[in-house]
């Protein structure tokens, strides 16, 4: 009888522990949504700044002169594909398949790293041609907006590498699930922001 009571108490303790993890995870994700709202304000401010400065060429080049749309299209494809592969990683996580999570995260990381490599190349090329952020208001707004997005993607890649290490070492724990959910929100958010950047900065700049 006493063993049954002890078993019931232990089961109740485990159930309460799981509920605590669930509630804590929900609060963490909610808090991360609030952070993303502040990031929305940041990018909205940068878009507004770019819109104001987009016609200030100061005798320098316009977007039509310097943007290579085919190059940026490939860059965009990398980021869009990384968003899809991250979705596959999340599906594997819900299935509890550690190897699948790590595999898809690795693919996502490679796509994200390819995106950043192309962005660094673009910035280096523009600066080498004398079209750095100090050249005109238009270029200042461009470098501020695109550069800030690039820094966010870099932070996401670092976060992703940390998650790969933690999941490889500790498995798919409740904490890892919560952190992956937050990272998923962050990564998809950056994808949406980049679509806006591609449309407003590059596409409209070339047309």
Swiss-Prot record:
Protein localization: Cell inner membrane
Annotated Pfam families: COX3
UniProt cross-references to InterPro entries, sorted A to Z: Cyt_c/ubiquinol_Oxase_su3 (IPR024791), Cyt_c_oxidase-like_su3 (IPR000298), Cyt_c_oxidase_su3-like_sf (IPR035973), Cyt_c_oxidase_su3_a-hlx (IPR013833), Cyt_c_ubiqinol_oxidase_su3 (IPR014206), Ubiquinol_oxase_su3_dom (IPR033946)
Keywords for this protein: Cell inner membrane, Cell membrane, Electron transport, Membrane, Oxidoreductase, Transmembrane, Transmembrane helix, Transport
GO CC field: plasma membrane
The keyword Ligase is annotated on this UniProt entry: no
Gene Ontology annotations of biological process type: aerobic electron transport chain
Keyword Ribonucleoprotein assigned: no
Functional summary from the UniProt entry: Cytochrome bo(3) ubiquinol terminal oxidase is the component of the aerobic respiratory chain of E.coli that predominates when cells are grown at high aeration. Has proton pump activity across the membrane in addition to electron transfer, pumping 2 protons/electron.
Name the record gives this protein: Cytochrome bo(3) ubiquinol oxidase subunit 3
Organism encoding this protein: Pseudomonas putida
Gene name of the record: cyoC
């Amino acid at each position: 009888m006493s063993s049954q009571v002890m078993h019931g108490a232990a089961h109740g303790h485990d159930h309460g522990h799981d509920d605590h993890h669930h509630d804590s995870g929900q609060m963490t994700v909610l808090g991360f949504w609030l952070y993303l709202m502040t990031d929305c304000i940041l990018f909205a401010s940068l878009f507004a700044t770019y819109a104001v400065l987009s016609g200030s060429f100061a005798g320098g080049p316009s977007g039509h002169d310097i943007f290579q749309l085919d190059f940026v299209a490939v860059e965009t494809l990398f980021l869009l594909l990384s968003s899809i592969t991250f979705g596959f990683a999340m599906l594997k996580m819900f299935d509890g398949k550690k190897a699948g999570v790590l595999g898809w995260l690795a693919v996502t990381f490679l796509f994200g790293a390819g995106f950043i490599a192309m962005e660094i190349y673009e910035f280096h090329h523009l600066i080498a041609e004398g079209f750095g952020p100090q050249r005109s208001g238009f270029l200042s707004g461009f470098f501020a907006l695109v550069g800030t997005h690039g820094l966010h993607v870099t932070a996401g890649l670092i976060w992703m590498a940390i998650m790969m290490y933690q999941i490889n070492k500790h498995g798919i724990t409740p904490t890892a699930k919560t952190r992956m959910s937050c990272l998923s929100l962050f990564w998809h958010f950056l994808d949406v922001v980049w679509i806006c950047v591609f449309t407003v900065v590059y596409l409209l700049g070339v047309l």
